[in-house]
């Protein structure tokens, strides 16, 4: 499975070292080890290969991040660290701010970022509605229906910024897009093809209007 992960990284044109791979393996093992204690992942995905698929899905967004040539990314609802920790691990030149409302998960994120030596990670512990700063790039994954949070996320998006939402089935993404397209200057659905047997897309929301 790790061989497939490396192959996917090469297809995505993501540079990596053996240290990156070792740290990813360490991270996944820590997620599995501390899942019960910190309420990190559901029971049905508590195995290494399932976690590696989450990591692969996470890193698939990195080319979009790099294409924007920005200095900082906000990951809202970071949970166990997918995608925030994974992106930060393979993209050390950018700062990743991980926003997580759960105290337990925020503690884990702080712990694992220290153990991985991720100096480009900052963890914030509060609700997204309480965030005061604005960001040029925002990521969300496993965050529910975008219709509920579009205005909230838009309010902390800098002018000219981009929200990248990791999504599943196309018909659902298209349905959500129809409700939020008038809130942004441009809305786009982009296919993610790194996991061949799963339907995955990015919903990209450019420049909040309100």
Swiss-Prot record:
Residues binding S-adenosyl-L-methionine, per UniProt: 77, 82, 100-102, 128-129, 141
Subcellular location: Cytoplasm
Pfam families listed in its UniProt record: GidB
UniProt keyword rRNA processing present: yes
EC annotation from Swiss-Prot or TrEMBL: 2.1.1.-
Keyword set, alphabetical order: Cytoplasm, Methyltransferase, rRNA processing, S-adenosyl-L-methionine, Transferase
Keyword Methyltransferase in annotation: yes
Origin superkingdom: Bacteria
Molecular function via GO: rRNA (guanine-N7-)-methyltransferase activity
Chief location of this protein within or outside the cell: cytoplasm
GO cellular component, one term: cytosol
Its biological purpose: Specifically methylates the N7 position of a guanine in 16S rRNA.
Family indicated by similarity: Belongs to the methyltransferase superfamily. RNA methyltransferase RsmG family.
Protein name: Ribosomal RNA small subunit methyltransferase G
Gene: rsmG
């Amino acid at each position: 499975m790790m061989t497939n992960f490396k192959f996917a990284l090469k297809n995505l044109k993501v540079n990596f070292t053996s240290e990156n791979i070792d740290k990813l393996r360490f991270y996944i093992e820590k997620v599995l080890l501390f899942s019960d204690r910190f309420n990190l992942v559901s029971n049905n995905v508590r195995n290494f290969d399932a976690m590696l698929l989450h990591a692969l899905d996470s890193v698939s967004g990195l080319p979009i991040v790099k294409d924007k040539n920005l200095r900082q990314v906000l990951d809202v609802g970071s949970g166990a660290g997918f995608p925030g920790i994974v992106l930060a691990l393979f993209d050390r030149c950018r700062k990743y701010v991980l926003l997580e409302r759960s105290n337990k998960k925020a503690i884990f994120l702080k712990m694992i970022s220290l153990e991985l030596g991720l100096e480009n990670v900052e963890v914030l512990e509060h609700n997204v509605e309480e965030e005061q700063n604005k960001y040029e790039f925002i990521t969300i994954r496993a965050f529910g229906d975008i219709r509920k949070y579009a205005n909230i996320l838009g309010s902390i998006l800098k002018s000219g910024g981009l929200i990248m939402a990791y999504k599943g089935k196309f018909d659902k993404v298209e349905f959500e897009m129809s409700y939020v397209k008038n809130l942004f200057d441009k809305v786009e659905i982009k296919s993610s093809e790194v996991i061949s047997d799963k339907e995955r897309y990015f919903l990209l929301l450019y420049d909040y209007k309100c």
